[in-house]
Amino acid sequence: MIVITLPDGSQREFPGPVTVAEVAASIGTGLAKAALGGRVDGKLVDTGHRIEGDARLAIVTDKDADGLDLIRHSTAHLLAYAVKELFPEAQVTIGPVIENGFYYDFSYKRPFTPEDLAAIEAKMTELAKKDEKVERRVLPRDEAVAYFKSIGEDYKAEIIAGIPAGQDVSLYREGRFEDLCRGPHVPSTGKLRHFKLMKVAGAYWRGDHRNEMLQRIYGTAWASKDELQQYLHMLEEAEKRDHRKLGRELDLFHLDEHAPGLVFWHPKGWTVWQQVEQYMRAVYRDNGYLEVKGPQILDQGLWEKTGHWDKYRENMFVTESEKRDYALKPMNCPGHILIYKQGIKSYRDLPLRYGEFGQCHRNEPTGGLHGIMRVRGFTQDDGHIFCTEEHILPECVAYTALLQKVYKDFGFNDIIYKVATRPEKRIGSDAVWDKAEHALMESLRASGCEFVVSPGDGAFYGPKIEYTLKDALGRQWQCGTMQVDFSLPERLDAVYVAESGERLFPVMLHRAIVGSLERFIGILIEQHAGALPAWLAPVQVMVLNITDGQADYAAEIAKTLQKQGVRAGVDLRNEKITYKIREHSMQKLPYILVVGDKEKAAGAVAVRARGNQDLGVMPLDAFSQRMASDIAHKV
C-alpha cells in the first residue's frame, strides 16, 4: 500500500503507484478538474507524475502561486506552438517565466510586426480551445540532440549538447509541437485561457552581443479574466505615470545616447534632487551620522582586498594611469573603512555612524537600463555603522523607526520586511550568526513589524533586512537595506581598542534608506503621477496676471514669496488667462495664483490648487501660511 498524506494531515491509501491526477480524483471531481500539478514531498510536478511510495502531496490549482507559475510556463510553450504553426521556418530557443508573465525568444528571417503579434495571440486562443493534452517523454541526451537537429531546431540541439553526456532530458508535446523542458506543465492547453501578448524586443542568443539577435515576445497570463483585466488596467495606469514620459513632459531630466545609463538633470529635476538630498542630509544630522565624502576612483589593490576585483570586476568601470589600474567605485563601503582607519578608534567611539551621498558607477548591460530607475551612474544615501555585536539590536531598531518616518514623509505607508538568513557558504561562527539574525528579527519585532524570513538568502558575510515599498499601483520596490557585515573590516584590517585593551574587528552595518537617489526620484514621480507634494515640487507656485495692468503686482507677489523661501515663478505673457492656467495646470503645480484688478486693489490673490480646485480670493499672508503648513506637514 502507498500512503499519501495531504496538507490537512489526512491520509489516503492506494494499492500501488498512483498519479497526482488520480489522487485529486479520489478526493473529488471538482479538485480533479481544477488540478494543474502537485507538490510531492516539496517538489513541483505534473498531474501525470507517478508517486511510487509513501509521500506528502499538495494538489496545485490556479488559486496557488505555484499554479500561476505553471500557467505562465505553459503559456510560454503555447506561444511557441502558435509561432511554429504560423511561421514554420522560425526557430524556438528559450521561454522562461518572469515576473507577471513570460517571454519566448525566436530566430526568424524578418521582424515580427504588431499584426503578427495579433495573429499569434489569436492562434494561441484557437489552440487553447482545442484542449490538447500536454504529454511528457524522456530521451537520452544524444537522441534528443539528433531529434531536434532532424526537425531543424538548431538552438534546441545546441542547448541539449551542453548537457553532460549520458544524462536524460525531458520533452513536452502538445498537438504537433514538442519542446525541450524540465517542466512541470499544466495537463492540457484548455487550462490556458487568460493571456495577452505584450510586445516584441530584441535579445542576443545566450545574452552575448557577438551572437545572433533574436526576437523576444513578451506575454502575460493569469488564472482568471478579472486578474488579467486588473493587470492590464494597472499597466495602463503605469504607462500614464511612467517617469520617462513625465520626465520629458515636466522638463525634469533627459537621457542621451552620448552617455548611456547616465542622467542629465534639468533645472526643475535638479531642484527635486536637491529637496530629496537636503531632506536626507537633515536625517543624517538629526540621527548621529557624520557626513563624509570619499573619492570616486580607487586603486585596483583595494578592490582585490575587498574581493570585488574577483567577484564584481565585470560590472566595474576600470581605467589606467601611470601604469596603475583603478576602478570607479561601484559602492562606498571600502572608502568609509579607509576613513574609519585614520586614527585609533576605541570602544568608546562606537557606534560610529558615517553617511555619504556617494556617487557610484556600475557597468550595467545596455538591455537592463531603464530610465533613471536602472542606470550606470547613481548616488546613494549610503551609511555605514561601525559597532560591536551588542550594538546591532539597538542600531537596527533605531534604523527601522527612522526608515518608516522617511518613507511616510515621502508618501509611502506600506512596507514589506524580509530577513535574509545565513547561506551554506559563509564566514563567521554559528554563534555570531545566531546573535546577528536574532538581533535583526528582534529589531523588527520591537518596531511592531511583521516580517518574512528568507532562509539562505543572506550574503556570505552576514544576514540582512530588506525593506520593500508598495506604491500606489501595488508595485513593489526594494529600497532600504540593513546588512550585517563580519568580513570587510577584517579584510581591510579595521580595528578598535576594546575595554580590555585588545584590538578587535568591529561589526559593520551597511544601510541605505532611499538607496539610489535617481531610482527613488523615479519611484516618487510614478507614485505621485508627476504631481509631487508641495514640499518636493520644483515649482510650488506660479503667479499669473490677467492683463498688463497687474504685471508689476504679479512680479511683486512672486518676489515676496521667493523671499519667504517658496519656489515661485511668474508668467507675464500677453496670453489669455485661461490658456496660461491650462498650460501651468499641465505642469502639475501645487498652486496657481491669479491676479486681476480686484486682487491688486485688495492686496490679495485668487488661489487655484492642483486638481482645478478654486480656493477663492485670500490675502497673500493667508496663502503664505497655507504654503508654509503644506511644506511643514510634507503635503
From Swiss-Prot:
Its cofactor is Zn(2+). GO terms for molecular function: ATP binding; metal ion binding; threonine-tRNA ligase activity; tRNA binding. SUPFAM superfamilies: Class II aaRS ABD-related, Class II aaRS and biotin synthetases, TGS-like, ThrRS/AlaRS common domain. It catalyses: tRNA(Thr) + L-threonine + ATP = L-threonyl-tRNA(Thr) + AMP + diphosphate + H(+). Binds 1 zinc ion per subunit. It is an enzyme of class 6 (ligase). Keywords: Aminoacyl-tRNA synthetase, ATP-binding, Cytoplasm, Ligase, Metal-binding, Nucleotide-binding, Protein biosynthesis, RNA-binding, tRNA-binding, Zinc. Its EC number is 6.1.1.3. One of its GO terms (biological process) is threonyl-tRNA aminoacylation. Pfam families: HGTP_anticodon, TGS, tRNA-synt_2b, tRNA_SAD. Disulfide bonds: none annotated. Catalyzes the attachment of threonine to tRNA(Thr) in a two-step reaction: L-threonine is first activated by ATP to form Thr-AMP and then transferred to the acceptor end of tRNA(Thr). Also edits incorrectly charged L-seryl-tRNA(Thr). Homodimer. This is Threonine--tRNA ligase. It comes from Methylibium petroleiphilum (strain ATCC BAA-1232 / LMG 22953 / PM1). The gene is thrS.
